[in-house]
Amino acid sequence: MDQKRLTHLRQLEAESIHIIREVAAEFSNPVMMYSIGKDSSVMLHLARKAFYPGTLPFPLLHVDTGWKFREMYEFRDRTAKAYGCELLVHKNPEGVAMGINPFVHGSAKHTDIMKTEGLKQALNKYGFDAAFGGARRDEEKSRAKERIYSFRDRFHRWDPKNQRPELWHNYNGQINKGESIRVFPLSNWTELDIWQYIYLENIEIVPLYLAAERPVLERDGMLMMIDDDRIDLQPGEVIEKRMVRFRTLGCWPLTGAVESEAQTLPEIIEEMLVSTTSERQGRVIDRDQAGSMELKKRQGYF
């Protein structure tokens, strides 16, 4: 393939499709993590392209915390049904029994039990040897130094000092029993690339990414959208309608909205062209402590 004749987005697309096909050919039991966000939507679109006109040769896995936005759950189920995908949903039963939630137990414990431990449970339960994720290197500093094929030991831990070289687009998927590889086909994409590709390919996304009047309150420097009644207002807090959208999606008590008037994809792209802040500025879990994302990844987080 003549790379010089491909546009920037088509080069990224070709690289990602190559990675997805490589994993499908190399591993015996891969899975695609599906977090319902924009990156997951792009990754799923690329996977469908990679195996068209056939169906996906692996299932989708959603590790559910019980605290995603309602619109995310609706979108997840509708998308899986529309594309004929096998969708696996796992929720940490111990966490559910303990009543773990972000308001009572805080973001760090909630993330560890419901996300990290939940993910490890699901990977062990189904015996997956490779798991696709939609993380990108431009998102956060620990992700910037992670390989496309990210080796995990039998406890699902990541060691940034023990990464494999990836020369000339050759990936080392050699593993022993119990070990696994996390695979990031979107590693070299930026947030702007994602939005331009969504626009180019007309990929459906969760409506929360588009600006609309939504009920929010200010707490701990974050605009929290109130998605259900599982919240106790603190003294002085007032819920008000504001024109907001989300740059990243997660559990609604831990994901801050941004004030915006961007109601269309071209308007979002225009915003991205002048933005000087990270999309993860609204993610509470990234503020738990210095280097919190790397610590989470060392423990088995995606």
Swiss-Prot record:
UniProt entry keywords in alphabetical sequence: ATP-binding, Nucleotide-binding, Nucleotidyltransferase, Transferase
Pathway: Sulfur metabolism; hydrogen sulfide biosynthesis; sulfite from sulfate: step 1/3
Gene Ontology terms, MF aspect: ATP binding; sulfate adenylyltransferase (ATP) activity
This enzyme's EC code(s): 2.7.7.4
Cleavable signal peptide: none
InterPro entries membership: PAPS_reduct_dom, Rossmann-like_a/b/a_fold, SO4_adenylTrfase_ssu, Sulfate_adenylyltrnsfr_sub2
GO terms classed as biological process: hydrogen sulfide biosynthetic process; sulfate assimilation
Keyword Magnesium: no
Catalytic activities: sulfate + ATP + H(+) = adenosine 5'-phosphosulfate + diphosphate
Keyword Ion transport: no
Purpose of the protein: With CysN forms the ATP sulfurylase (ATPS) that catalyzes the adenylation of sulfate producing adenosine 5'-phosphosulfate (APS) and diphosphate, the first enzymatic step in sulfur assimilation pathway. APS synthesis involves the formation of a high-energy phosphoric-sulfuric acid anhydride bond driven by GTP hydrolysis by CysN coupled to ATP hydrolysis by CysD.
Record's subunit section: Heterodimer composed of CysD, the smaller subunit, and CysN.
Descriptive protein name: Sulfate adenylyltransferase subunit 2
Native organism taxonomy: Bacteria, Pseudomonadati, Pseudomonadota, Gammaproteobacteria, Enterobacterales
Gene: cysD
